[in-house]
Each structure stands twice: as C-alpha cells, then as structure tokens.
Amino acid sequence: GELKEKKDLNVGWVHRNGRRYFFNHREEQVGTDQVKKVIDVSEHNGRISDWKKVIDDNGVDGVIVRLGYSGTEDKELAYNIKELNRLGIPYGVYLYTYAENETDAENDANQTIELLKKYKMNLSYPIYYDVENWEYVNKSKRAPSDTGTWVKIINKYMATMKQAGYQNVKVYSYRQLLQTRLNHPDILQHVNWVAAYTDALDWNNPHYSGEKGWQYTSSDYLKGIRGRVDVSVWY
C-alpha cells in the first residue's frame, strides 16, 4: 500500500484526461492546464544533434537559447537557432551579463541586437538579461553588490533594447538575489523568469503580472541531450 501511495503523489508533470498539469513538491498545482514545459540550453549542453526528437520525446513546448555572455557568443548559438528556425520550434534567448556599469549594459544590449539580426531570430519567448552574482575565476572582478548600480545597469539595457525596437525584453535571475540586491520595483517590473530549485517557488512578484516562468531544476535528464538540463514551467 505504501509504495502505491508514494507513486500516486501529484508532483511534476501529470497527465490526466488528455491534459497536462504541473505540481510542485508540495503537490500544489502551478498555473492551469495551459502550462508549458520550457528548457534552456547553451554550449554546456553540447551539440544537440536531433532537436525534433528532443522536443517530441520530452514534451518540450519551448526553448530559451543562450546568446552568450558579455562580449562572447555562445559556441552552439548559430547551430541551435538554425535548427529551431528550420523546425519551427518556439524559442527565446538570454544573455548572461558581466556588467559593472551602464556602459557595459549598453554594450550588452548592442551585442544582443547584433546577434538577433545576425541569425534572423524569430522569437516566441522573450529576450532575457541574465543577472547573477557573477565573479571572475581569479576573483579580480565581481558583480556590483548594491541595488542602485543594478537598477542603472538594467534600466540602461532595457532602454537600449527598446530604442532599437525590441519590446519583449525581460530579466532572469534567481530567488535569493531577487529578495536582496535586485529587490527594487524598477528591476522587478521586468522579472518574469525565476530560478529556485526548491519544493516550491515561494516568491511572489507584485510588480509584474502576465505570463511567467519558474526554473525549478538545473539537473533534469532529457532524452537527446547529454548531461543535465535546466527545466522551467511556464504559466
């Protein structure tokens, strides 16, 4: 009896009556039956030789592709976009920032725009500015620690993107950072994709309403992709 009860827990992706639902580890439903399963990929996932199979075998609805990081293009970007375009798979993109100031943020935006044009991107999901607590390997540089600097950086990136005609631009970060140094209305209004590898998201953004994503794991295994994959529920 006990094993059966365990097996029937409503956790993760659950199929019922031809519909699909998502439950967190407290068995609380996230969103409705319209939730989407979204993965994000970069060169760290290696060469994904059969994108169609990845989508079909894993029930993936969308992909967020890494453009690269400040000043550098992701080695698999050209290939990933070519394949997603060819197969008509819905995607968005993200740029990991090493910005320390507004000049860096403007450079990040120009890099983003350049890559969007270079690969003729046809986006179904947003363009994400990936803001994390970065530091150089040798610790010679690290992310600004004060909220005010991040407000300036993010405002500058957003303004530069908007000026170039890009409207659907958002911020991705993780819960702990959003509760601390990124906890400012000017930043939170742009945040709709959040990482928290915990039983539940346990975070609410009063400054944004609309479709959003919870990246609930960085260590799922999907058929057709080597190594561990980030997976999000879109709701």
Indicate residue ranges for each PLM-predicted region.
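Extracellular adhesion/carbohydrate-binding repeat motifs centered on closely spaced tryptophans
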Residues: 1-34
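Conserved beta-strand positions
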Residues: 41, 65, 129-131, 171-174, ...
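Structural recognition of alpha->loop->beta junctions
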Residues: 113-128, 133, 182-209
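Functionally critical loop-and-helix segments that line ligand-binding/catalytic clefts
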Residues: 31-43, 49, 57, 187-235
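Glycine-rich, charge-decorated loop segments at or immediately adjacent to ligand/cofactor-binding or catalytic sites
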Residues: 104-107, 177-185
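Aromatic-lined carbohydrate-recognition surfaces of secreted/lumenal glycan-active proteins
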Residues: 166-179
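Substrate-binding cleft of extracellular glycoside hydrolase catalytic domains
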Residues: 34-158, 162-164
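Hydrophobic anchor at the start of a short beta-strand
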Residues: 91, 167-169, 192
